[in-house]
A protein has these predicted regions:
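Active-site histidine-anchored catalytic micro-motif
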Residues: 1-167
Length: 167
């Protein structure tokens, strides 16, 4: 499974034009979240652009669409790790805790159980930014999403390590 996943990632990355002119600083990226057949080429372009500017990213805060989560508040997966065909990736528990304590999201790992919008991004992060951590957040469509984004912007601004948001 590992080799097939790496081969597929490389295939998508090879389709990305090299050294595109980019904005001064990429702080965030928008990525599609369909299966790789439909969305990986664009996701590869986004992650490649981030890599072009930032050789190392400490943490990716990943916002995911809520397809089967019907809670009112954004749900943070705030403990442990996720597993993909490329192995484990660690949740940045410290940053996740700060986000939950902001009052704009709740701790709810179960909300992520039947969602796919975040997990399709994680292998790109593992492959291109080995050692990076994640903070996965399922975000229902509500005004609270805007408030959450503002709070996370403030929180990230106080971090001393490189954090990039993906959604």
């Amino acid at each position: 499974q590992h080799d097939g996943c790496v081969d597929e990632i490389n295939e998508y990355l090879e389709g990305v034009p090299a050294n595109k002119e980019l904005p001064d600083t990429i702080a965030a990226g928008i990525v599609p979240h369909a299966g790789w057949t439909f969305s990986a080429a664009l996701a590869a372009a986004v992650f490649s652009a981030i890599k072009q500017q930032h050789e190392k990213v400490h943490t990716f805060v990943i916002f995911g669409a809520a397809h089967s989560y019907f809670g009112n508040s954004p749900a943070v997966f705030d403990r442990g790790h996720w597993v993909t065909p490329l192995g484990e990736i660690t949740v940045n528990e410290d940053l996740a805790e700060i986000i939950v304590k902001s009052g704009q999201a709740v701790s709810d790992s179960g909300a992520h159980r039947n969602e796919h919008s975040i997990e399709v991004q994680v292998p790109f992060i593992q492959y291109l930014f080995g050692g990076a951590k994640i903070v996965p957040i399922i975000v229902p469509p509500s005004r609270g999403a805007i408030t959450l984004g503002q709070a996370i912007g403030d929180i990230i601004g106080k971090q001393d390590k490189k954090v990039v948001c993906i959604g």
